[in-house]
Amino acid sequence: MKNMFQKCMSAFVAAAFFVSTMGTSFAATPETVQAKLDLCETDTYGQPQTGAIMERINKLEKDYDGTHRTGSMMARTNAIYDSMYTNTATPSILAELNGIEWTIRHEVSATPVQERVTDMETELSGKTSEGTYTKRIRALADFAFGANQLPIEQTSVAANTLVKVALAEEVTSKNVKKGDTVHFTVADDVIVDGRLIFAKGEPGTAVVEKVQQARNFGRNAKLELTDYKVKSMDGTIVDAYVGEEAKEEMKQYAMAAGASLAGIVILGPIGIIGGAFVKGKDIDLPAGTEMYIETTGDTMLYGVTTTLAK
């Protein structure tokens, strides 16, 4: 019986993995003043702000720097954007904030800067502080690390680095359509060479490529996802896909969970998921369903130095 199951499993795995779509396109960097302001404001306040463009630029500059920059509208917007997102000579503001939050909570949230800073101040000292976000973040870093500079260093992250993720919402073959975005979060920390690269709680997305409803004659529903993207600790959007290593991890995961042959789901590029989430012939994956993806290519990312094992 065991041998028969293994033979059936091998055949099933071969069938389940015949489709594996790789997401290779990078998320487009906003180019216009409006688009960059929208993104900066969303990550700072929770949503884009209203009002004249110059008023919005002035507000961001005041909240982060306490002063106004000089130069053109585009130059000032670029300066704000770069300080928040660009990791070149030094880590970005969001990279530093992620590092602080992970050190305090061992998890990173997707809430806006103003909420994250306020929550951590209250958690650590019982009250909120005054001043710019930059000043308050430096103070949090000093409390968390004993210095206002975080132990963050650049690290080479190889292609095919595995990342365990969990669905942030229910996904079923009945409630999604082609082109929909599926949201997930990093389920476990990923540490490379002693540095935290992907922190638990970081967000990610995939796109529904194909949905096929359950049909007559015992034909089960199918769901294919593509264009996986996951945010690293330093805020970089990293392309990912379901490659051979991710498939093998999910195969072992499903078998370790005792998934039966009849209950394992074919989920297109996602691969094999535990059978406990299948209801009849439809695909029904609740929020929290875990799976594996892997990075598409080699990349340089900032990571927080940690003594935790990988």
Question: Where would I find each of the regions flagged by the language model?
Answer:
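Bacterial N-terminal signal peptides that target proteins for export
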Residues: 2-12
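Alpha-helical, heptad-rich or low-complexity scaffold/stalk segments
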Residues: 28-141
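N-terminal targeting leaders of membrane proteins
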Residues: 138-156
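Contiguous beta-sheet cores, especially beta-hairpins with glycine/small-residue-rich turns
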Residues: 150-266, 272-310
